[in-house]
A protein has these predicted regions:
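Short His-centered aromatic/hydrophobic patch
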Residues: 1-6, 24
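A conserved, positively charged/aromatic
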Residues: 14, 20-47, 63
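Donor nucleotide-sugar binding/catalytic pocket of nucleotide-sugar-dependent glycosyltransferases
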Residues: 45-83
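A conserved mid-protein helix/loop that constitutes part of the nucleotide-sugar donor-binding site
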Residues: 99, 109-124, 188, 224
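Aromatic "clamp/platform" in nucleotide-sugar-dependent glycosyltransferases that forms part
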Residues: 160, 179
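Short hydrophobic beta-strand element within catalytic cores of glycosyltransferases
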Residues: 196-199, 209
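Conserved acidic donor-binding segment of nucleotide-sugar-dependent glycosyltransferases
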Residues: 211-212, 216-223, 232-237
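A short, well-ordered alpha-helix in the C-terminal region of glycosyltransferases
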Residues: 225, 232, 239-254, 260-266
Length: 274
């Protein structure tokens, strides 16, 4: 729930026996001195809080008792990608032999998403046949950086696309270069498309990837580390493909809607018996 939705639920249930369960999917700062937080996530009337990641629970533990929180990662069903598999999209101008890295993120006004760092990483790979496909909103300054830099021919800035996920099938790597993030949906989508993942070592995103098995985890805020990670996977395409297959099995078995509903029902049952 958003802060506004949670506040509305608290006001609407005032004076009723209804129990309010909150959801926290971000590591955004919480200020105890700011009274508006007590209209939402810090309100003592909240019976329980569902946290998207363990790191979020640890952050909230400064304000909320751990026994009032449950970690429940967002689910993803591979069947949601059936139409994507049936109608994949490609990018014109990229050689069929190229190693294709894709990034799905809206970075306009959000420098923490790491697009500029990723562009700098590609500039360290101009001696390769590695191409970056970027889909999402971006700042003009980042576009100019990409188009005026030494890797311009290897960077394809496609902008926002409602059908962005249709570009995932057949790509070699999906990358999340963020300096902070929660638990990116794009990584789940990539895993459901059997695409290996490279993520920065930040809370939330790193939980999705098993380092060395479904992808690799690299140092954050480091174009050099990102470039080296891409180079390593490009040098062993067979292993990269195996990582994509392993990621598919992980998302298919560990992030099911059935398991998510089971955890949620367990929380509801426990609250109602108190």
């Amino acid at each position: 729930s958003s802060s506004i939705d949670l506040s509305i639920a608290l006001f609407a249930s005032w004076g009723t026996p209804a129990r309010v369960v909150g959801y926290r999917g971000t590591q955004a700062k919480i200020r105890r001195s700011d009274p508006t937080y007590y209209l939402g996530i810090l309100n003592p009337r909240i019976a329980h809080v569902m946290c998207a990641t363990e790191d979020i629970k640890q952050q909230l533990a400064r304000f909320i008792s751990p026994d009032r929180m449950t970690v429940s990662p967002k689910p993803y069903e591979v069947m949601w990608m059936e139409d994507v598999w049936a109608h994949p999209k490609s990018v014109a101008g990229i050689p069929s032999t190229a190693f294709q890295v894709i990034c799905l993120a809206n970075t306009k006004g959000r420098s923490f998403k790491g697009l500029r760092i990723l562009i700098r990483a590609l500039e360290l790979l101009t001696d390769t046949d590695i191409h970056l496909i970027y889909l999402g909103e971006y700042d003009k300054a980042d576009y100019k950086l990409a188009q005026n830099g030494p890797a311009a021919k290897q960077i394809h800035m496609l902008g926002p696309h409602k059908d962005a996920v249709y570009y995932l099938p057949g790509k070699d790597v999906c990358i999340c270069p963020s300096t902070r993030d929660a638990s990116p949906r794009s990584l789940r989508e990539a895993m459901a498309c059997k695409v290996a993942c490279i993520v920065t070592d930040i809370p939330g995103a790193r939980d999705l990837v098993v380092d060395g098995r479904t992808g690799i985890i690299v140092q954050a805020v480091s174009p050099q580390a990102i470039a080296e990670g891409i180079r390593v996977l490009a040098a062993d395409r067979a292993k990269t493909k195996m990582m994509g297959e392993a990621g598919y099995q992980r998302i298919r078995t560990d992030y099911t809607m059935e398991e998510y509903v089971r955890r949620l029902k367990g929380v509801f049952d426990a609250i109602m018996t108190k």
